[in-house]
Amino acid sequence: MIRHFLALNQFTKEELDGLFTLSRELKDKQKQGVPHRLLEGKSVALIFEKSSTRTRVSFEVGVAQLGAHPLFISSATSQMGRGEPIKDTARVMARYCDGVMIRTYGQEIVEEFARYSSVPVINGLTDLFHPCQIMADLFTVIEYKGGYQGLKFAWVGDGNNMANTWIEAAAILGFDLALACPTGYEPDRQVWDWAQQRATSSITITEDPEEAVRDADVVNTDVWASMGQEQEQKEREAAFQGYCLDDALVALARPDCMVLHCLPAHRGEEITDSVIEGPRSAVWDEAENRLHIQKAIMASLMK
């Protein structure tokens, strides 16, 4: 049976922990200059309907380091952008490639693609979930803290794809999560209900960023207006006043807390320059770890 990586809810705690372990092994080999061409001779299609810097570079480099050949495909220059049915593209790509990564808008697109694909499909981002990023974030936490158990995670800002995926991760892995989101910008209701039924840890939501951040071990945020929401920028700026991760807000967290941001950051909006450049910031290690965790995901699915 073909295994895909579309959302964290497809996986058990043990399976996700296994990916963290493999990621550590691959990162160590890369740092030591030890070849780890686990996908030698394979080809991986990288389909982008949403443009990206980190996703494209980390996947292309990761595919190459695993010994495979990356194929960048933009919807603007492919038949997908001209209305070819997803199921047709999926079946054809599977005849040429050994795996597919898709970065797109609707979660239903990656799910339909996977349904018709005979090779593994990886969700590089949708409007609902961003599983590769949360896995990179958690791998970074493990590196800094030695694990995630017993920690309090705080999310401040939009209840977007990042927040939705953090909620799934907390329910599966069993850590406490406190979210602070303005009214009208809460996480997806179905994701929330699923997590509340499953979670053995505390997953809470408030409108008060100070309440969410207080005594947190990990503090996380993201842009207020995601790609495709640019026309809502002014409205969102007004709604998110008081939700900026600044020195005063971060000071409410534990003294040894770490700050995460998936990037790109709008400094002075959701996070200040002093915080992202400060001693608590793990943002650059977090960005690097996209490479390592995605290699672990690809290797586990495609080798």
UniProtKB/Swiss-Prot annotation:
GO molecular function, one term: ornithine carbamoyltransferase activity
Biological processes annotated in GO: arginine biosynthetic process via ornithine; citrulline biosynthetic process; L-arginine biosynthetic process
Keyword Cytoplasm: yes
Short name of one Pfam family: OTCace
Listed pathway(s): Amino-acid biosynthesis; L-arginine biosynthesis; L-arginine from L-ornithine and carbamoyl phosphate: step 1/3
Family: Belongs to the aspartate/ornithine carbamoyltransferase superfamily. OTCase family.
Name under which the protein is recorded: Ornithine carbamoyltransferase
